[in-house]
Amino acid sequence: MQIRTYQVDGYTPGVDYPIYNTVPFGLAFTCGGKLPGYYADPEARCQVWHWCLPNGRQFSFLCPNGTVFSQTTRVCDWWFKVDCQDSPRLYGNNDELYRDVNGNKI
């Protein structure tokens, strides 16, 4: 299997941005005590994101190489457009997922 890496001029893959080909084993992130929703994982430089269900169950996913999970938009975006280290401060954004158009909790 060939693994593609995407070079961005002036930057080094794996140094300036992550290039995992699988979700790394042993990440410390857990869904315990968190709202259901989507969470960037700074330990994996945000190339990994986690989906936390209401029952605490966790699923982990990998953004394509050259992209990382944006906690602001809750999608994978180009690595240079995301402040990964700021992600934990934005975890509360998941509360928006469970509100109606008027801002009432559903």
Where are these regions (language model features)?
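Extracellular secretome segments
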Residues: 1-106
